[in-house]
Amino acid sequence: YAGVSNFCGWQLAKAATWQLASPGVRTRLASTQMEYSLLQRGVEREVLPAALDLGVGLLPSSPLGRGVLTGKYRTGTPADSRGASELLAPFVEPYLDDPASRIVDAVATAADGLATTALQVALAWVRDRPGVVAPIVGARNAQQLTEALSVEALSLPDEICQALDDVSAPVHRYPDQDWSTL
């Protein structure tokens, strides 16, 4: 199987088209890997529509918003977390702002209402998105892996999916940035 990672929509289309140009000679693209979560929905702009059109599956990386969607950062940065690491803190920090906290609160509320965990709600949401084949989880121990795998039994009600869609709706500017600030 062949796949690509972090390609924008036009790059994905170009690679997939090139692969298809010689049937039987080149391997068809099976997947693309991009960051995708309730905190990062940018792939919905171009990458996901291209992947769906091309029959290429999406492997979302950081489906838990770099760990933030688990709720562990709601009251501070745990000492044993990636956010406390000097090396990884810059990776986590962009998702510790006010808009992200509103999304994390919505995930926690949904989890409480479903008697499950925020991790499971966030992972189920991304798992059920169109074009997603399998979220990539970064479990650091057996307990985290077990919890992530148990999401297979969770089905989110439509009302919760819609509420999470609404609170995390991306702002798409023409075409990809706010030109009024230039």
Regions found by a protein language model. Give the residues of each.
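Short arginine-rich
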Residues: 156, 173-175
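Short coil/turn segments at secondary-structure boundaries
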Residues: 176-180
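Beta/alpha (TIM)-barrel catalytic core signal, keyed to glycine-rich beta->alpha loops juxtaposed to Asp/Glu
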Residues: 1-167
